[in-house]
Amino acid sequence: MLEKYIDEVARTTGNTFMTENKVPPHLTVAAIEARSVKELRQPFLDMAKGLKAGSISLVSTGQLLPYVFYVTPVLNEYLTELSNKVYCAFKDLPDAEISKYYRPGNWLPHVTIGKKLSEEQMKQAFEVMYKRFQPLEAEIVEIGLSKVNPHEDGLIDNV
């Protein structure tokens, strides 16, 4: 269903950033700036071993102005624990910095369905999702470590 929302926003707005860059539906748990991706590999693998799948309820849409349109889950116990585990896995790395917007207790979980939208495209995305969006239950079954802009999957592990 999330892929359909991404496709619908792209089709309606003409903004194909998400589809052209093959950005899959995902919930970003942390944004880490690191000197080298290699230093993130082992902490990621160690952390991923202890994770389990979990359920989320995607209940609303929103905007991170000026460019991002998203659907958002209820922040439940599973997501809170996931955020804490990811933060703890990377917080002490000397050459890595976790964004202040993705730390436990200071995080807006969301699934981006439109990115790099103009003001007019944002309005179009809102209009189409106002008509189409239906709350849904989803299962978190994988965790990945990816580069962004453009999107590039690095490591993916089942949870």
Task: Cite the ranges covered by each PLM segment.
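Glycine-rich beta-strand-turn "strand-cap" elements at beta-sheet edges
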Residues: 61-65, 140-154
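Basic, often amphipathic N-terminal segments
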Residues: 1-55, 78-137, 152-159
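Short hydrophobic/aromatic-rich beta-strand segments that constitute the beta-sheet cores
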Residues: 29, 70-71, 113, 145
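Short, flexible active-site-adjacent loop segments at beta-strand->alpha-helix junctions, enriched
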Residues: 33, 62, 67, 75, ...
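Hydrophobic, well-structured mid-protein blocks that either form specific transmembrane helices
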Residues: 49, 53-65, 69-74
